[in-house]
Amino acid sequence: MDKLTPEQRKKCMKASSKNKGTKPELLLAKYLWALGLRYRKNDRSIFGTPDLSFKRYKIAIFIDGEFWHGKDWDIRKYDIKSNKDFWISKIEHNMNRDKKVNDYLISNGWVIFRFWGKDVLKNPEKFSLEIQKAIYERCVR
């Protein structure tokens, strides 16, 4: 049983959800910065609010958490133990939203990068160089 009233819990959750960036986001941002690349974080003027973006080059970067965005979903959805219907619906909604965001941005000339958070943690240099290459290709076309 929760010691806080629903209103108090809502206030606490809202206060703690200020987006400061996840570890994978911060790590990739650090590598991009070291390459001399200047990005925007969570730019709400771009549909889907990418984690990092280069508006000038129309490049949007999303670093997705494996659970929240349904990595290996066909297998992992059966691992959920409690409140199964809620979580399956929630994650599938997130996956559908990700697809809509991708489709919209691509149809408007954007290059989309979607990386899994754990992959970024393992090899941030690889992903930062991939982004750098895409920016270069956008510059010379």
From Swiss-Prot:
This protein's UniProt keywords: DNA damage, DNA repair, Endonuclease, Hydrolase, Nuclease, Restriction system
Cross-referenced SUPFAM superfamilies: Restriction endonuclease-like (SSF52980)
GO biological process, one term: mismatch repair
CDD domains: Vsr (cd00221)
Domain of life of the organism encoding this protein: Bacteria
E.C. number(s) listed in UniProt: 3.1.-.-
Signal peptide: none
GO molecular function: endonuclease activity
Family according to the record: Belongs to the Vsr family.
Function: May nick HpaII sequences that contain T/G mispairs resulting from m5C-deamination. If unrepaired, these mismatches can lead to C-to-T transition mutations. The very short patch (VSP) repair process counteracts the mutagenic process by repairing the mismatches in favor of the G-containing strand. This enzyme is an endonuclease that nicks double-stranded DNA within the sequence CTGG next to the thymidine residue that is mismatched to 2'-deoxyguanosine. The incision is mismatch-dependent and strand-specific.
Annotated protein name in UniProt: Type II nicking enzyme V.HpaIIP
Organism expressing this protein natively: Haemophilus parainfluenzae
Upper taxonomic lineage: Bacteria, Pseudomonadati, Pseudomonadota, Gammaproteobacteria, Pasteurellales
Gene that produces this protein: vsr
